[in-house]
C-alpha cells in the first residue's frame, strides 16, 4: 500500500494529490472516469461569505469568516456535496471615495490595491473558494444596472427626496429613533445629516410577506437571537422604505436612466450572490445559476445581519427569486 501511494504521488503533482486526499477517494476515482454516474446525482451546496469592504486592509474578523466558511466547504465536499464557495470584495461607496482622495489616488486604484491584498491573504491561507467576485467586475456592474431598472419599471423603486441621518463608515441610513445615544446603532460612530434627491425602494410593500416567511421558516435566520433582533427592532415596528441611490458622491454604479445617481452600495453588494453565478434579470440566467440558487448558506458577521435578512430577501422577492436557505450571523472576533 505504501509503495502504491508513492506511485500515485509521482503521477499527480503534490498540491493536487493532497486536495484529492482532502476531498476523498471518490474524487480520485472520478478523475479515472469511474464515478461519473455518481457525479450526476451529487447534491449541490452553495456557500458564501460576505464580500470584504475595500476601505482598508482586511481585519481579523474577515479572516475569521473566511476560515469558518472554508471549513464548512471542505466538510461538505467530504460528505459528497458538489460545493460552490464564493467570496470576494465590495468596492463602491462614499467611504472608499474619501479614502482614495486621502491617499491621492483614484477610487479604482485604491480598491485594486486593497482587493489584491485581500485575495493574496485568502490564497496564502489556502482557502478553497471557487469564485472571487469583485463588485467592480464589468458583468456585475451591468447586471446591477439592469436589476435597478427592472425594479423601477415594475414600480418597486420610486424617486423622492431623502432627508435624515447617515453613517458613512456603515454606508447606512437611520432615523432619529434608531440611534443609540445619538450615534450609529451598528458601529457607535457619529452620524451626519444628509439631504439629497434619491430613489427609494418600497420595503413596506414586502414587509408583511417577509414577516410571514420568517415565521414559517425558523431555520432562515440563525442563531435565533438574531432573528428576534430583526423582528422586534425592525420588522414589527414597521419597515420604512429604503434609499437606494445617492447623488452626493460619484464612486458607485450609475443608475442607467438617471446617471447623476449612483446605486446605493448595499443594493450593489448584496446582488453579488446571484450575479457571481450568472443571474440575468432578463431571463437569460446561466445553467450554473439555475443549478446553485438558492444559496444554502450565507455566512456573515452579526453587524450586517439586517442587510442580509431584511433588505436582501425583499430584493429577491421583488425579483421573484427564492430566498437563501439560511443566513447565519456569527459573532465578532476582535484584536486586543
Q: Which positions does each model-derived feature cover?
A:
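Short hydrophobic targeting helices and cationic amphipathic motifs
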Residues: 18, 29-31
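Structured secondary-structure scaffolds
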Residues: 39-87, 139-143, 193-336
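Short, charge-patterned binding micro-sites
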Residues: 89-95
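A charged helix-plus-loop insertion that forms the helical arch/lid used to bind
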Residues: 99-112
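A broadly conserved sequence feature marking short terminus-proximal activation segments
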Residues: 110-166
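Cys/His-rich short segments
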Residues: 154-207
Amino acid at each position: 500500500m505504501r509503495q502504491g501511494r508513492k506511485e500515485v504521488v509521482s503521477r499527480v503533482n503534490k498540491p493536487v494529490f493532497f486536495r484529492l486526499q482532502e476531498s476523498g477517494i471518490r474524487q480520485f476515482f472520478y478523475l479515472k472516469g469511474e464515478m461519473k454516474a455518481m457525479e450526476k446525482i451529487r447534491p449541490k451546496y452553495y456557500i458564501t461569505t460576505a464580500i470584504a469592504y475595500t476601505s482598508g486592509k482586511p481585519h481579523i474578523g474577515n479572516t475569521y469568516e473566511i476560515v469558518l466558511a472554508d471549513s464548512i466547504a471542505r466538510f461538505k465536499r467530504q460528505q459528497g456535496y458538489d460545493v460552490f464557495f464564493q467570496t470576494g470584495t465590495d468596492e463602491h461607496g462614499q467611504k472608499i471615495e474619501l479614502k482614495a482622495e486621502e491617499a491621492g489616488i483614484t477610487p479604482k486604484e485604491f480598491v485594486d490595491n486593497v482587493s489584491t491584498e485581500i485575495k493574496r491573504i485568502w490564497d496564502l491561507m489556502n482557502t478553497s473558494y471557487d469564485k472571487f467576485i469583485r463588485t467592480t467586475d464589468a458583468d456585475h456592474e451591468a447586471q446591477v444596472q439592469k436589476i435597478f431598472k427592472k425594479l423601477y419599471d415594475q414600480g418597486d423603486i420610486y424617486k423622492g427626496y431623502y432627508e435624515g441621518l447617515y453613517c458613512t463608515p456603515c454606508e447606512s441610513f437611520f432615523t432619529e429613533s434608531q440611534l443609540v445615544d445619538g450615534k450609529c446603532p451598528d458601529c457607535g460612530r457619529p452620524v451626519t445629516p444628509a439631504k439629497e434627491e434619491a430613489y427609494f425602494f418600497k420595503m413596506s410593500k414586502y414587509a408583511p410577506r417577509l414577516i410571514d416567511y420568517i415565521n414559517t421558516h425558523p431555520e432562515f435566520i440563525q442563531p435565533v437571537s438574531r432573528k428576534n433582533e430583526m423582528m422586534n427592532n425592525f420588522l414589527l415596528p414597521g419597515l420604512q422604505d429604503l434609499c437606494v441611490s445617492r447623488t452626493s458622491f460619484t464612486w458607485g454604479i450609475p443608475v442607467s436612466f438617471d446617471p447623476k445617481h449612483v446605486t446605493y452600495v448595499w443594493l450593489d453588494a448584496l446582488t453579488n450572490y446571484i450575479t457571481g453565478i450568472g443571474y440575468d434579470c432578463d431571463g437569460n440566467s446561466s445553467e450554473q445559476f439555475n443549478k446553485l440558487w438558492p444559496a444554502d448558506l450565507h455566512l456573515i458577521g452579526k453587524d450586517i445581519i439586517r442587510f442580509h435578512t431584511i433588505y436582501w430577501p425583499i430584493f429577491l422577492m421583488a425579483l421573484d427569486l427564492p430566498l437563501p436557505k439560511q443566513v447565519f450571523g456569527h459573532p465578532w472576533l476582535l484584536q486586543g
